[in-house]
Design a protein with these regions (language model features):
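Short hydrophobic/aromatic-rich motifs at helix boundaries and adjacent loops
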Residues: 7-10, 40-42, 65, 113-115
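Short acidic-hydrophobic, aromatic-tinged amphipathic segments that line or gate anion-handling sites
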Residues: 106-114
């Protein structure tokens, strides 16, 4: 499996984890985002700053994954929500957050100077996600968005139905 061509870059500075998000925050990068945040949270990290300076677009899957980290899991009362901060989100991204009723979940930062930390690829090898991984994370993300606000149900009802059906279909060789 090839290594991701445009990875999310990571810098750990004090208690904060900075994630430099590439130009497009989409369903493919959502798998990587989930792996990075999950791994670092298990290591005790709770504050994540997403540098969106270079990010021009964000899709609903990426946003649903992010929202899943902000809200504690209902199945585990001891789970804690993470502090996710969005740095330099452009108007297109903030409009998406507002339209999906999740803008209140995040802290916003605006910095005129670029982030000068030394960013590196994450230490664990992350490969291009499989179709199954993308389907699973996309379904989970869209269900999360529907749970957050009932206004999202009609927006994602067909998508979640399709993803459920895709998940049941055995892969063809």
């Amino acid at each position: 499996m090839p290594i991701i061509s445009n990875p999310i870059l990571v810098a750990i500075v004090g208690e904060r984890v900075f994630l430099k998000i590439p130009e497009r925050a989409n369903c493919l990068s959502s798998v990587e985002l989930d792996q990075i945040i999950t791994t670092l949270h298990r290591r005790g990290r709770e504050v994540f700053v997403l540098d969106l300076t270079q990010c021009t677009t964000m899709d609903s899957t990426f946003l649903g994954v992010l929202a899943g980290f902000v809200l504690p899991a209902d199945s585990n009362p001891k789970s804690t929500s993470l502090d996710i901060r969005l740095r330099n989100a452009n108007r297109r991204i903030t409009a998406l957050l507002e339209s999906l009723c999740v803008d209140h979940l995040f802290t916003y930062e605006r910095e005129s100077e670029p982030c000068t930390f030394v960013f590196e690829t994450f230490s664990m090898e992350i490969s291009e996600p499989t179709k199954t991984q993308v389907n699973v994370i996309s379904l989970k993300a869209h269900l999360q968005l529907m749970e957050i606000d009932p206004l999202n149900v009609p927006k994602f009802k067909d998508v979640t139905q399709f993803l459920r059906e895709e998940s049941k279909t055995p892969p063809t060789s």
